[in-house]
């Protein structure tokens, strides 16, 4: 009985990473999908794409064995010195799927992540990218409302 359990456990361990890897969306699939939507996509490294949308360069990183996706945009038109932590925290508390912060260079940075565990599809990536674009707009609206108020 113990022998059968050991064999079953070994089979699960051996094949589990394969199924997770199979669910990973490749960088080239992401690039092709976003390019087909009219976005300017640039391959800048083994796991990184930059996508130009209006005035923003959005960095997409594909990380880890499950293909976790990280979207980041640096909002260079916003001076980090002019944005209080109160404004950042208000936005971060209201938006649970993204976050805005001031990076080590003083740049205002917006980030959103997708955990690849369980798999993701091109449709998920396209949807996430649209959500990230809305998140940028939402933060800029939030910032404007705080400055005007």
Where in this protein do the model-derived segments appear?
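Bacterial N-terminal signal peptides
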Residues: 6-16
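Short, internal acidic amphipathic alpha-helical interface segments
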Residues: 72-111
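Extracytoplasmic/secreted envelope proteins and their assembly/folding machinery
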Residues: 27, 31-34, 85-88, 126-129, ...
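N-terminal secretory signal peptides
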Residues: 22-68
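Sec/Tat signal peptide C-region and signal peptidase I cleavage site
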Residues: 16-22
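C-terminal partner/receptor-binding element of secreted or periplasmic proteins
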Residues: 118-149
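A mature extracytoplasmic/lumenal domain signature
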Residues: 45, 53-55, 62-64, 73-77, ...
């Amino acid at each position: 009985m113990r022998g059968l359990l050991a064999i079953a456990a070994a089979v699960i361990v051996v094949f589990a990473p394969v199924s997770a890897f199979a669910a990973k969306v490749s960088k080239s699939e992401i690039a092709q999908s976003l390019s087909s939507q009219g976005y300017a996509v640039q391959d800048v490294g083994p796991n990184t794409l930059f996508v130009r949308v209006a005035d923003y360069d959005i960095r997409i990183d594909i990380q880890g064995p499950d293909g976790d996706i990280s979207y980041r945009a640096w909002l260079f038109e916003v001076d980090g010195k002019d944005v209080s932590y109160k404004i950042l925290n208000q936005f971060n508390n209201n938006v649970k799927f993204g976050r805005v912060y001031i990076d080590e260079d003083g740049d205002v940075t917006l980030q959103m992540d997708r955990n690849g565990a369980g798999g993701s599809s091109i449709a998920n990536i396209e949807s996430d990218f649209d959500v990230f674009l809305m998140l940028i707009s939402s933060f800029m609206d939030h910032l404007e409302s705080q400055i005007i108020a």
